[in-house]
UniProtKB/Swiss-Prot annotation:
It is found in: Early endosome. InterPro entries: WASH_strumpellin. Belongs to the strumpellin family. GO terms for biological process: actin filament polymerization; axonogenesis; cardiac muscle tissue development; endosome fission; endosome organization; heart contraction; neuron development; protein transport. This is WASH complex subunit 5. Component of the WASH complex. Pfam families: Strumpellin. It comes from Danio rerio. One of its GO terms (cellular component) is early endosome. Acts at least in part as component of the WASH complex which seems to regulate washc1 nucleation-promoting factor (NPF) activity and is required for its membrane targeting during endosomal sorting. The gene is washc5. Disruption phenotype: Morpholino knockdown of the protein induces cardiac contractile dysfunction and loss of motoneuron formation.
Length: 1159
C-alpha cells in the first residue's frame, strides 16, 4: 500500500486536509472568543435599554417583519442600528466565517466518508483506511476535532450571544440574498444549547449528545472509530511507558479522543455497561480528570453523571479506597523523586559518561516525575471541580489530604523536572550531533595504539625489556586492521565485533603474561577503554529523544498552569535567578504546540503561521504575565526611593561648611536608598539571565521583556493616577481644577524623576520610554473620548495606541465623560461657561459675572502643560475640535429643522429682506423695521445663542492652547519651531503661486505632506483655530439675514464699558461678548465667503440707517446698538486679521475713527 500521507495518495491527503483545517478552526475559535463585543452579552441595564430593540436572538426569525417594523417606526432607532452595523460588521463577519467553517468542516467530512463508501478512491474503503496506522489516526482525529469544536464554541461563546451575533450578521450582510448561502444550516447547528459555563449552572437535558447529533454523521463510521479507540494503541505510546501503572498516562491522548467521540453514540454511555467497564478499566482505572484539547479539562464524575452505564463503570475508580491508594502512591512518588532530581541537577553531576551509562535509569526518573506531576496537577485543579457540587468537593478534599498536596512542592518538582529534562535533551542533542565524529576518533585512537604495540613487539621500537615476538606483532597488526574495518553505518555488526575485540584484548593479556610490563598493559587498557566508548557512542539513539518528548508532554497544563502564577511570582520575588529554571518549564509547555501543528505542518497548510502565532502568542503573553512581578517589584522599590529622596534626604548645597557635613550625611536614609537600588539591579539581572528563547515561533528577548514589563507597569500606574487624580466635583466652590492639576503635576513629576533615576540601573532609555508611553496613554484616552462623537467608533483592536503586550487600562466612567481627558475638558468648559463668566481678551482672563472675581486665566494652560505635557494640550485641542463639530452640526439641525421650517419666522425673514434691499442703500424708518423683526423672532434665538456661545467659548480655549503650545515649542525646541514655521510659509507661498499660475507644482491628493505637516503645526501651535473649516455645508436660504437678525436681537442686552469693552447690561441675561463674536465668526467661516460679505453689508446698512435716523431726529447720543454693531465689526476685523477696509466698505471710516470719542 502507498504511504497514506504521501502527496500522491488522494484519499490520505483529503482526510489530512480536513484534520489540518480542524486544528486551525479550533485555534480561530479560541482566538475570537477574546473578541466578543461586550454589547452582545446585554449584561448591563444601559446596554439593554439602548440596544435591546436592535439585537435579537433566533426569535427574530419567527417574525422578521415585526422586528424590522419596530425599527422603521422610530428614526432614532434606525440611526442607532446603522451606527451599530458600521461598528460591528467587520468583527461579525469574522465570527460568521469561523462558524461557517465549522459547518463546512463537518459537511466535508461527511462527503469524504461518502466518497470512501462509493469507491471514489481506488482500492480504498473505510475498513482499509482504518487498518492503516496513519489512516486510523486521521479518521479518529477527524471525528474528535469536530466534537472539540462544538464543545469549545459552547464553552467560550454562550448560546444567546451566538444567536444574537448570527441574527445581526444576517440582518447586516448580503448573506440572506445569496442563493448559495448556508446560513440556515449554520443557525441550526449553532443555535443555543442552553448550556452555561458559569459555575453552578444547570446542565441541559441530553447535553451534549443532542448538540452533537444536529448534523447526522454515518453511525457505521462512528462505531468503527470508537472500536479502534477502544481496542488499539493508535499512537503507539505504550512503548514509551513500559510500566503497567503508567498505562493510563500512555493512553491519555486516546482517552480524551474516546471521551469526545462517545457523545456521538450516547447509547454506549447510557446502557452498554460491559463496554463502559472495559473503557474505564483500560483508560480511567486511576484517573477521572482529563484534558481534552490544549488544556481544556473535564471531570468525568460530573460529565458522566447523567449516563447510567458510564456512571456505574466509573464508580470503581471513584471508590474511596482506590482514590486513597492512587493519591498515596503519588504522594510517596513526590517525596522520593524530589531529592533524586535535585541530586541529578547538582552542578557537574550530569556528565556525558554518566548519561551514557544510565540512560534507562534517567528515563525512568523522568517518566515517574512527569506521571506524578500530571496526575496531581489534573486531580487538584480548581477548574476541574464545581464548588457547588458536594460530591466533587468531597473527592477533591480527599485527593488533597491523601496526597499531602502542597502546590509549592509540586511546582518545585515541575521546575526541577523541566530543568532536568532540558539539560538532558540539550546534552543528548549535542551527543547525537557529535556521535559519528567521536566514534571515528575513538576508532582511530584504538587502531593506532594496536599498531604501536605491534611495532614494540617487532624489536625495532625500543621499549624497556620487551623481547621481540613476531606472533604478537602479527596479532596486534591484525587487531588494528579489525578495529579499522569497523563500519559506523552498520551499527549492530560493529557493536558485536567491538565486544569480541575487547574480549580478545583481555585474553591476550592473560595468556601471554603481559601484565609484567606496565606500559604494554597501559596500551591495552587504553584501547579497551576506546572500544568501550565506541559501544557507548553507537548506542546514542534518537529514540531516546522521542521518548523524552512523549514523556515530557505538558499540553494538559496549558490552562491549569495559570493557577501556579502566584507561586511562580513569589519565587521570583524571593530569588530573581529562578527565572532560568522557569525558562525550562516554559519551553516544556511550548512543546504542547506540537499537538495542533503536527497535521497542519504535514499538509503544508498556509494556516501554519497564524495557528503557530496564536498559540505562541498565548504562551508569550503568559510568560509576560509571570515576569511582570519583576517590574512591579521594581516600581514598589522605586516609590520608596522617591519618597526618601523627596521627604527625607536633604539636598546638598553647592557650598558646605565642614562642621555641617555630618548633618547632611544622613547615612541611614542613604543606605536605605542604596539597598533598594541594589534590589532593583538584582531584579534586572534575574530577568536577563533567562537568555533569548524561542517560544513556539516567537523569539523572546529577555531585555525586550524587561523593557515591555517596565512600560506596562508605568502605563498601569500613570493611567491609574490620571484616572483618579482628574475627577472633579462640579458643585465645588471654587473649582477643584487648579489644585488638582498642581497635585497631578507633582505626581507626574514624581514618576518622571523615578524613571530618570532607574534608567541607568536597568539599562533602558528612560526619557524615550516616558514620552512614548505617556503620549500613548493620552492619545488613547483622547481617541476613546472622541469615540462618543464618532459614528464609526475605533475599537480597541483597531486602535494604533492600544497594545496587547502593554495594554492601556480602561476604567469605568464616573460621569458623562468616558476618560480623564473628557472630565478635564468638561471641567474647563464648566468654569469658563459664557453664561456665568465674562472673558476679557486683553488679559486672557475669565471673571465671574456676578462677583467680578477672577475665575481662571491663561496660567491654566501652562499648568496643563506641566501636568500632561504637549500631548495633553494637543489631545485637549483635538477633543475641543470634535466638540465644535458636534455643536455646529447640532446648530445646523436646529436651523434647518426648526427655524427654516417655521412659516411665520420665514415670512419675517422675507419681509426684512424686502425692506433692506438694496443693501447699499438706507432703510427707511430703520428703528421700527429692525425692532419689529427682532421682536417677532425673539423666541427662536435661545438655542441659537447657546450654540454660538459654546462654539465661541471653545474657540477661545483653542486659541489659548495654541498660544501655550507655540510658546513652549519656541522655548523648548526653537529649531523645530523655526523649521516648521519656514516650511509652513514656503508651502503656503507655493500654493498661492500655483493659484496665480496653475502650471506651477501643487501637492497632489495622494501626497500626504499637507496632512503630516498639519499635525506637526497643530502640535507646535502654529495655526489659527479661527480659520479652521470644521464641517462641510450646503447652501442655506436666508443665512446672512438670519445671522444678522440674531446679532441685532442680542445687542440690546449689551452695553459698552470703557474698562472692559462690551459687557452684559444685566447679569441675568448671561451673555459674553468674545464668545458671541468668535462663535458667529466660526459659523460664517464654514460657509462660502459671499455669506460673510452679505452679513457684514447688512450690519453696515444697520449702522448707517440708525445713524441717519438719529441725525435726522437730532438725537445727540449714539445709540448703544450702533456702538455694539461697530464694536462687532471692529472685533471681527481684528480676529480674522482682515484689512480694515473690509469694514470701511460698509461703514464710513470717520464713524470708525470717531465713535469711541463720543462714548
Amino acid at each position: 500500500m502507498v504511504d497514506f500521507l504521501a502527496e500522491n495518495n488522494l484519499c490520505g491527503q483529503a482526510i489530512l486536509r480536513i484534520v489540518s483545517r480542524g486544528n486551525a478552526i479550533i485555534a480561530e475559535l479560541l482566538r475570537l472568543s477574546d473578541f466578543i463585543p461586550a454589547v452582545f452579552r446585554l449584561r448591563d441595564k444601559t446596554d439593554q435599554q439602548k440596544y435591546g430593540d436592535i439585537i435579537c436572538d433566533f426569535s427574530y426569525f419567527k417574525g422578521p417583519e415585526y422586528y424590522e417594523g419596530k425599527l422603521e417606526a422610530k428614526p432614532e432607532l434606525q440611526d442607532l442600528d446603522e451606527e451599530f452595523r458600521e461598528n460591528n460588521i467587520e468583527i461579525l463577519t469574522r465570527f460568521y466565517l469561523a462558524f461557517e467553517s465549522v459547518h463546512k468542516y463537518v459537511v466535508d467530512l461527511i462527503r469524504c466518508l461518502d466518497d470512501l463508501n462509493e469507491g471514489v478512491y481506488i482500492q480504498q474503503t473505510l475498513e482499509t483506511v482504518l487498518l492503516n496506522e496513519d489512516g486510523k489516526q486521521l479518521l479518529c482525529e477527524a471525528l474528535y476535532l469536530y466534537g472539540v469544536m462544538l464543545l469549545v464554541i459552547d464553552q467560550k461563546m454562550e448560546g444567546e450571544v451566538r444567536e444574537r451575533m448570527l441574527v445581526s450578521y444576517y440582518r447586516y450582510s448580503a448573506a440572506r440574498s445569496s442563493a448559495d448561502s448556508n446560513l440556515d444550516d449554520i443557525c441550526k447547528l449553532l443555535r443555543s444549547t442552553g448550556y452555561s459555563s458559569h459555575p453552578g449552572a444547570k446542565r441541559p437535558t441530553n447535553y451534549p449528545e443532542s448538540y452533537f447529533q444536529r448534523v447526522p454523521i454515518s453511525s457505521t463510521f462512528i462505531s468503527m472509530v470508537i472500536g479502534r479507540l477502544r481496542s488499539d494503541d493508535i499512537y503507539n505510546q505504550v512503548s514509551a511507558y513500559p510500566l503497567p501503572e503508567h498505562r493510563s498516562t500512555a493512553l491519555a491522548t486516546q482517552a480524551a479522543m474516546l471521551y469526545v467521540c462517545l457523545y456521538f453514540t450516547p447509547s454506549i454511555l447510557h446502557t452498554q455497561q460491559a463496554k463502559m467497564r472495559e473503557i474505564v478499566d483500560k483508560y480511567f482505572p486511576d484517573n477521572w480528570v482529563i484534558s481534552i484539547y490544549m488544556g481544556i479539562t473535564v471531570n468525568l464524575v460530573e460529565a458522566w453523571e447523567p449516563y447510567k452505564a458510564a456512571k456505574i463503570a466509573l464508580n470503581y475508580t471513584l471508590d474511596t479506597a482506590n482514590i486513597r491508594e492512587q493519591a498515596g502512591r503519588y504522594a510517596a512518588s513526590v517525596e522520593t523523586l524530589r531529592p533524586q532530581v535535585q541530586q541529578l541537577l547538582k552542578e557537574g553531576f550530569l556528565r556525558e559518561e554518566i548519561i551514557l551509562d544510565n540512560i534507562p535509569k534517567l528515563l525512568n526518573c523522568l517518566r515517574d516525575c512527569n506521571v506524578a506531576i500530571r496526575w496531581l496537577m489534573l486531580h487538584t485543579a480548581e477548574s476541574a471541580y464545581d464548588p457547588n457540587n458536594k460530591r466533587l468537593r468531597q473527592i477533591k478534599d480527599q485527593v488533597i489530604n491523601d496526597s499531602k498536596y502542597n502546590p509549592k512542592i509540586l511546582f518545585q518538582l515541575l521546575l526541577d523536572t523541566a530543568q532536568f529534562e532540558f539539560i538532558l535533551k540539550e546534552m543528548f542533542k549535542q551527543m547525537l550531533a557529535e556521535k559519528q565524529l567521536k566514534w571515528e576518533s575513538y576508532k582511530k585512537e584504538g587502531s593506532e595504539r594496536m599498531m604501536e604495540l605491534a611495532e614494540v613487539f617487532s624489536g625495532v621500537k625500543p621499549l624497556t625489556r620487551v623481547e621481540k615476538n613476531e606472533n604478537l606483532q602479527a596479532w596486534f597488526r591484525e587487531i588494528s586492521k579489525q578495529i579499522e574495518s569497523l563500519n559506523y553505518e552498520d551499527s549492530t555488526a560493529a557493536g558485536r565485533k567491538t565486544v569480541q575485540l575487547i574480549q580478545a584484548l583481555v585474553e591476550v593479556q592473560e595468556f601471554h603474561q603481559l601484565e609484567s610490563n606496565l606500559q604494554v598493559c597501559q596500551f591495552l587498557a587504553d584501547t579497551r577503554k576506546f572500544l568501550h566508548q565506541m559501544i557507548r557512542t553507537i548506542n546514542i539513539k534518537e529514540e531516546v529523544l522521542i521518548t523524552m518528548q512523549i514523556v515530557g508532554d505538558l499540553s494538559y497544563a496549558w490552562q491549569i498552569i495559570d493557577s501556579f502564577t502566584a507561586i511562580m511570582q513569589e519565587s521570583i520575588r524571593a530569588n530573581p535567578s529562578m527565572v532560568t529554571k522557569l525558562r525550562a518549564t516554559l519551553l516544556k509547555l511550548a512543546s504542547a504546540l506540537d499537538l495542533p501543528l503536527l497535521r497542519i505542518n504535514q499538509v503544508n497548510s498556509p494556516d501554519l503561521l497564524s495557528v503557530s502565532q496564536f498559540y505562541s502568542g498565548e504562551l508569550v503573553a503568559y510568560v509576560r504575565k509571570v515576569l511582570q512581578i519583576i517590574p512591579e517589584s521594581m516600581f514598589t522599590s522605586l516609590a520608596k526611593i522617591i519618597k526618601l529622596q523627596i521627604h527625607d534626604i536633604m539636598e546638598v548645597p553647592t557650598r558646605l561648611d565642614k562642621d555641617k557635613l555630618k548633618d547632611y550625611s544622613q547615612l541611614s536614609a542613604r543606605y536605605e536608598v542604596a539597598k533598594l537600588t541594589h534590589a532593583i539591579s538584582v531584579f534586572t539581572e534575574g530577568i536577563l539571565m533567562m537568555k533569548t528563547t524561542l517560544v513556539g515561533i516567537i523569539q523572546v528577548d529577555p531585555k525586550q521583556l524587561l523593557e515591555d514589563g517596565i512600560r506596562k507597569e508605568l502605563v498601569k500606574r500613570v493611567a491609574y493616577a490620571l484616572h483618579k487624580g482628574l475627577i472633579f466635583n462640579p458643585k465645588a466652590k471654587p473649582s477643584e481644577l487648579m489644585p488638582k492639576l498642581k497635585e497631578m503635576a507633582a505626581t507626574m513629576d514624581g514618576f518622571y524623576r523615578s524613571f530618570e533615576y532607574i534608567q541607568d540601573y536597568v539599562s533602558i532609555y528612560g526619557l524615550k520610554i516616558w514620552q512614548e508611553e505617556v503620549s500613548r496613554i493620552i492619545n488613547y484616552n483622547v481617541e476613546q473620548e472622541c469615540n462618543s462623537f464618532l459614528r464609526t467608533k475605533i475599537q480597541d483592536w483597531q486602535s494604533v495606541h492600544q497594545s496587547t503586550h502593554i495594554p492601556i487600562p480602561k476604567y469605568p466612567s464616573v460621569d458623562e465623560s468616558a476618560t480623564f481627558i473628557g472630565r478635564l475638558c468638561r471641567e474647563i468648559l464648566r468654569i469658563t461657561d459664557p453664561k456665568v463668566t465674562c472673558y476679557i481678551d486683553q488679559l486672557n482672563t475669565w471673571y465671574d459675572l456676578r462677583t467680578h472675581q477672577e475665575v481662571t486665566n491663561n496660567r491654566l494652560f501652562s499648568e496643563i502643560q506641566d501636568t500632561l505635557g504637549t500631548f495633553g494640550l494637543n489631545g485637549l485641542d483635538r477633543l475641543l475640535c470634535f466638540m465644535i463639530v458636534k455643536e455646529l452640526q447640532n446648530f445646523l439641525t436646529v436651523l434647518q429643522k426648526s427655524i427654516l421650517k417655521d412659516k411665520a419666522v420665514v415670512d419675517v425673514f422675507k419681509a426684512l429682506l424686502t425692506a433692506v434691499n438694496p443693501v447699499k442703500g438706507i432703510v427707511a424708518n430703520a428703528s421700527k423695521v429692525y425692532t419689529n423683526a427682532a421682536a417677532k423672532t425673539q423666541k427662536i434665538w435661545s438655542p441659537y445663542l447657546e450654540s454660538i456661545m459654546k462654539v465661541g467659548q471653545m474657540q477661545i480655549l483653542r486659541q489659548q492652547i495654541a498660544n501655550e503650545l507655540n510658546y513652549s515649542c519656541k522655548f523648548d525646541s526653537k529649531h523645530l519651531a523655526a523649521a516648521l514655521d519656514n516650511l509652513n510659509k514656503s508651502l503656503l507661498s507655493d500654493i498661492e503661486a500655483h493659484y496665480q499660475d496653475p502650471s506651477l507644482p501643487y501637492p497632489k491628493e495622494d501626497n500626504t505632506l499637507l496632512y503630516e505637516i498639519t499635525a506637526y503645526l497643530e502640535a507646535a501651535g502654529i495655526h489659527n483655530p479661527l480659520n479652521k473649516i470644521y464641517i462641510t455645508t450646503k447652501r442655506l436660504p436666508y443665512f446672512p439675514i438670519v445671522n444678522f437678525l440674531f446679532l441685532i436681537a442680542q445687542l440690546p442686552k449689551l452695553q459698552y464699558n470703557k474698562s472692559q469693552g462690551m459687557a452684559c447690561r444685566k447679569p441675568a441675561d448671561a451673555l459674553d461678548w468674545a464668545p458671541l463674536v468668535l462663535g458667529l465668526l466660526t459659523l460664517l467661516k464654514q460657509f462660502h465667503s459671499r455669506y460673510t460679505e452679505q452679513f457684514l453689508a447688512l450690519i453696515g446698512q444697520f449702522i448707517r440707517s440708525i445713524m441717519e435716523q438719529c441725525t435726522s431726529q437730532k438725537i445727540p447720543d449714539m445709540p448703544s446698538d450702533v456702538v455694539g454693531a461697530l464694536m462687532f465689526l471692529e472685533d471681527y476685523v481684528r480676529y480674522t486679521k482682515l484689512p480694515r477696509k473690509v469694514a470701511e466698505a460698509h461703514v464710513p471710516s470717520f464713524i470708525f475713527d470717531e465713535f469711541r470719542t463720543v462714548l
